[in-house]
């Protein structure tokens, strides 16, 4: 049963990241790809888990650079990383803070439950709520980048997202060897939520 939950979790994770990617990049994704892409990713995870795990972090960057070859690499990297990082941040925020308010504790990533899938499916609506509340417009980022307003800021954001990805992955991979890995991951999550949304 745990394997089924795990596969459904990864399927829903890719689905949510695709929705986030389309929202911020304004690149249309055909509805069929919302079915095929998560399925192919789950298949890759079954065949070769390490490749599937690391491909998750870089597939959207590679896709963006391939599709927009003659446009800014910094913007392509931003569009590739942002959905993955925001999915991770908001998912952990829901798991660490919102669900415990409801009496549901899902701190341990080693044991999965149906709540993990529910959390994943709530990430996109939660992101929409934050974007609407803060009145964020991703088209303004694109326009500002064309005029060189955000170039260095976006470079710093990309570096910070890569650092987040590296730190969280390290704590997940070495959770058995590092004392208080879950607590440190929570602190990193808090810091990056403040950095991204405040």
Model regions and ranges:
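Alpha-helical membrane-embedded segments
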Residues: 122-125, 189-197
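Signal-transmission coiled-coils
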Residues: 182, 197-198
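Juxtamembrane segments at transmembrane-helix boundaries
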Residues: 2, 7, 15-29, 47-178
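Membrane-interface helix-start motif
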Residues: 176-188
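Hydrophobic, membrane-inserted alpha-helices
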Residues: 14-18, 36-44, 58-63, 192-197
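Transmembrane-helix signature of polytopic, membrane-embedded enzymes
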Residues: 29-35
């Amino acid at each position: 049963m745990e394997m089924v939950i795990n596969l459904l979790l990864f399927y829903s994770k890719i689905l949510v990241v695709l929705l986030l990617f389309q929202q911020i990049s304004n690149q249309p994704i055909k509805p069929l790809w919302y079915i095929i892409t998560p399925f192919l990713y789950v298949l890759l995870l079954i065949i070769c888990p390490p490749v599937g795990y690391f491909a998750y972090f870089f597939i959207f960057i590679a896709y963006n650079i391939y599709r927009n070859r003659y446009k800014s690499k910094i913007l392509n990297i931003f569009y590739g990383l942002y959905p993955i990082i925001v999915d991770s941040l908001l998912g952990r925020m829901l798991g660490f803070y919102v669900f415990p308010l409801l009496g549901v504790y899902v701190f341990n990533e080693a044991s999965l439950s149906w709540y993990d899938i529910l959390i994943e499916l709530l990430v996109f609506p939660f992101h929409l709520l934050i974007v609407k509340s803060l009145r964020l417009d991703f088209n303004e980022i694109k326009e500002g980048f064309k005029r060189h307003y955000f170039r260095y800021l976006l470079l710093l954001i990309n570096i910070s997202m890569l650092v987040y990805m590296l730190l969280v992955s390290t704590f997940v991979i070495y959770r058995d060897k590092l004392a208080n890995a879950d607590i440190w991951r929570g602190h990193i999550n808090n810091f990056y939520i403040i950095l991204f949304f405040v």
